[in-house]
Amino acid sequence: MQEFVKRMIVEREDLKGKINRAKKAIENPPFGSDREGIEMLKKQVEGMETYLFWLCQRLDKEGV
C-alpha cells in the first residue's frame, strides 16, 4: 500500500472521531456554550462530513 493511501486512512479515522466528538458537543453543549457557537459547530460538522465523503471516495478509487 502506498504511503499517501496509509495517510488518508489515518486521516479518515481521525476525522470520523472529530465528527463524533463534535456531534456529541452539539447534542450536549458544554457549559457556557452560546447558541451562535453551537450553530457554527453544526456548520463545521457539515463541512467535515463533506470532506469525509470525498476522502472516502478517493480511498474507494484506490481500492481501500
Predicted region positions:
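Extended, charge-rich alpha-helical interface modules
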Residues: 1-64
